[in-house]
Amino acid sequence: CLRSGYQADEGTQLGAVINSTQRSRILSAQRETIMRGGQPILDGGTADVAGREGYYIKPAIYRATPDLNCNPAEVFHAFATICPVTDTEQALQLANSTPYGLGASVWTKDISRGVELAKRFRDGTCQVNCHNTIAYGLPYAGQGISGGPGAGVNCEETFTDYTELKAIYVADYPDS
């Protein structure tokens, strides 16, 4: 299980969230998932870190059926809902039915099949047999309401979306 703690401490895998507003959003999503029928595997909640102030939260994993719509919001934390499916088509339909599309992962022994499936996900980044791997030189953005076009400033192409060119020439000030 992921270890919550102070981010500079060795062994910490999950640091504090940025502020109380984000903590409230995450805890609210955890409660809503249970209200919608999600069964806790790891129940989440707040975490106490001895001697440290901060907004620490435990990881949360829930089991649900696809019809429960247990992903009420995009939660940026160690939060997952596991929905068993009967086949690949159902998995793709479930993944592509949300308004979110930041990233997806396909885990398989058959790399060719994994790449074919990755092409069918509606997201900005899809990875096969890895997750959250970002390479410089490739854009990192989402689809739908996740991230938005050009959201990931990770290469020259996306960096220029946020800049305006300007040249300033300076000569030595002439002596009087």
Show where each model-derived region lies.
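NAD(P)-dependent aldehyde/semialdehyde dehydrogenase
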Residues: 1-99
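Conserved C-terminal structural/oligomerization subdomain of aldehyde/semialdehyde dehydrogenase
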Residues: 56-176
